[in-house]
């Protein structure tokens, strides 16, 4: 499929909307009423610090809702107000935040069900309204919904769309897209649907593995078994890794994405020489500004004198997980929670998710005496949720 031609055609349809329905002023006001917090505003104004009794809170200087998330959430809410009586569906979670998604359910927005990773669109009918989430949707899903005669409300983050343009450029010039991401993640599934040949690498270790194969130091069967679910149909590593371009899932760790780009640039330079590099490697710049800002702020926060650190965001949120990774590199006692309800004031306990593990209970997690607590949140976490967490910490400390 010519994905660029399809998207151009879709954008000109009178059943497609990517701008929303409210004015920017009204949209900002609605979000402020729903999700902003006076406490968080005052902490920002006070240099991102707050002291109450023995508790000293230090907030990251960039955290919480990013512009793309604010836009997606606002458009989803506007859609229900604009279509008060129609069936409204959403192809996935609007963002990785349980409270926001629960609010959509209360507004009678229906979530497309999936079984074994396959979505069931059979209940979606002509004239229904379908919201595409901030992560985007696959081009196949868009085509299906368009052919069904649905009204499509596209809240895809513009930074995600930018990555789609990048992989389409790779396809046009017959380069394989190497996508730094999680192959099951909604955003990467969408991005790969716009690519031609592609391979998804999770981290630097996998990138180095692919590099070794390109340089002739790998086993084909082992390679294909390793990446069986993370490559395009008919992928041939002996042919499809001769010309590569790098792209990324926008929520991945910025420093790792940059290093993966350097790995493949060095690999192609070594194999084909400097005079042929541009024919075998395409440079990239698809790192999301908001992701970069939050990760940079986290690196600054973990350099502070902290006793513990609380990371707030959905457990399936990639950008939140990477914030947790940064804390771990500094050996700070850190706790990833998705809602304030994970903290028990009465028990001084926290039900949290260690990186790569199942949820576990930590009793007496807030130490006695003076304590410095660092706090950050993922791009899908409203300020009000952060404020509720701080209030619980204050209650425990007092």
UniProtKB/Swiss-Prot annotation:
Pathway: Isoprenoid biosynthesis; dimethylallyl diphosphate biosynthesis; dimethylallyl diphosphate from (2E)-4-hydroxy-3-methylbutenyl diphosphate: step 1/1; Isoprenoid biosynthesis; isopentenyl diphosphate biosynthesis via DXP pathway; isopentenyl diphosphate from 1-deoxy-D-xylulose 5-phosphate: step 6/6. [4Fe-4S] cluster binds at residues 66, 157, 288. (2E)-4-hydroxy-3-methylbut-2-enyl diphosphate binds at residues 96, 185, 250, 317-319, 380. It holds the Pfam family LYTB. Binds 1 [4Fe-4S] cluster per subunit. Dimethylallyl diphosphate binds at residues 96, 185, 317-319, 380. The active site is at residue 187. GO terms for biological process: dimethylallyl diphosphate biosynthetic process; isopentenyl diphosphate biosynthetic process, methylerythritol 4-phosphate pathway; terpenoid biosynthetic process. It catalyses: isopentenyl diphosphate + 2 oxidized [2Fe-2S]-[ferredoxin] + H2O = (2E)-4-hydroxy-3-methylbut-2-enyl diphosphate + 2 reduced [2Fe-2S]-[ferredoxin] + 2 H(+); dimethylallyl diphosphate + 2 oxidized [2Fe-2S]-[ferredoxin] + H2O = (2E)-4-hydroxy-3-methylbut-2-enyl diphosphate + 2 reduced [2Fe-2S]-[ferredoxin] + 2 H(+). Its cofactor is [4Fe-4S] cluster. Isopentenyl diphosphate binds at residues 96, 185, 317-319, 380. One of its GO terms (molecular function) is 4-hydroxy-3-methylbut-2-enyl diphosphate reductase activity. It comes from the Bacteria. Its EC number is 1.17.7.4. The keyword Chaperone does not apply. Keywords: 4Fe-4S, Iron, Iron-sulfur, Isoprene biosynthesis, Metal-binding, Oxidoreductase. InterPro entries: LytB/IspH. Belongs to the IspH family. Catalyzes the conversion of 1-hydroxy-2-methyl-2-(E)-butenyl 4-diphosphate (HMBPP) into a mixture of isopentenyl diphosphate (IPP) and dimethylallyl diphosphate (DMAPP). Acts in the terminal step of the DOXP/MEP pathway for isoprenoid precursor biosynthesis. NCBIfam families: ispH_lytB, PRK13371.1. This is 4-hydroxy-3-methylbut-2-enyl diphosphate reductase. It comes from Prochlorococcus marinus (strain MIT 9301).
């Amino acid at each position: 499929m010519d994905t660029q031609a399809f998207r151009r055609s879709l954008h000109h349809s009178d059943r497609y909307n990517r701008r929303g329905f409210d004015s920017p002023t009204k949209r900002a006001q609605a979000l402020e009423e729903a999700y902003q917090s006076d406490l968080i505003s005052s902490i920002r104004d006070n240099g991102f610090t707050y002291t109450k009794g023995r508790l000293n809170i230090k907030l990251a200087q960039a955290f919480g809702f990013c512009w793309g998330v604010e836009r997606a959430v606002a458009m989803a809410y506007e859609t229900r107000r604009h279509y008060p009586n129609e069936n409204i569906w959403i192809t996935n979670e609007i963002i990785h935040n349980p409270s926001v998604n629960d609010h959509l359910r209360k507004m009678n927005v229906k979530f497309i069900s999936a079984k074994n990773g396959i979505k069931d669109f059979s209940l979606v009918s002509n004239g229904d309204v379908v919201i595409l989430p901030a992560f985007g949707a696959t081009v196949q899903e868009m085509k299906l919904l368009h052919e069904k005669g649905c009204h499509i409300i596209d809240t895809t983050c513009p930074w995600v769309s930018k990555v789609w343009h990048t992989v389409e450029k790779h396809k046009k010039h017959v380069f394989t897209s190497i996508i730094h991401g999680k192959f099951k993640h909604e955003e990467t599934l969408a991005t790969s649907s716009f690519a031609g040949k592609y391979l998804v690498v999770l981290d630097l270790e996998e990138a180095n593995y692919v590099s070794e194969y390109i340089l002739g130091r790998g086993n084909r069967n082992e390679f294909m078994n390793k990446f069986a679910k993370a490559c395009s149909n008919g992928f041939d590593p002996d042919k499809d890794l001769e010309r590569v371009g790098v792209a990324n899932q926008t929520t991945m760790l910025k420093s790792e994405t940059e290093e993966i780009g350097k790995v493949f640039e060095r690999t192609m330079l070594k194999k084909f020489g400097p005079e042929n590099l541009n024919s075998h490697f395409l440079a990239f710049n698809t790192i999301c500004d908001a992701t970069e800002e939050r990760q940079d702020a986290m690196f600054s926060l973990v350099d502070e004198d902290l006793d513990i650190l609380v990371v707030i965001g959905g457990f399936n949120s990639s950008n939140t997980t990477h914030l947790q990774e940064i804390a771990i590199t500094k050996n700070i006692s850190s706790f990833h929670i998705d809602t304030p309800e994970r903290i028990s004031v009465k028990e001084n306990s926290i039900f949290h998710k260690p990186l790569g593990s199942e949820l576990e209970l930590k009793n007496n997690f807030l130490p006695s005496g003076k304590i410095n607590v660092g706090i950050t949140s993922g791009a899908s976490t409203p300020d009000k949720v952060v404020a509720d967490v701080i209030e619980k910490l204050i209650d425990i400390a007092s």
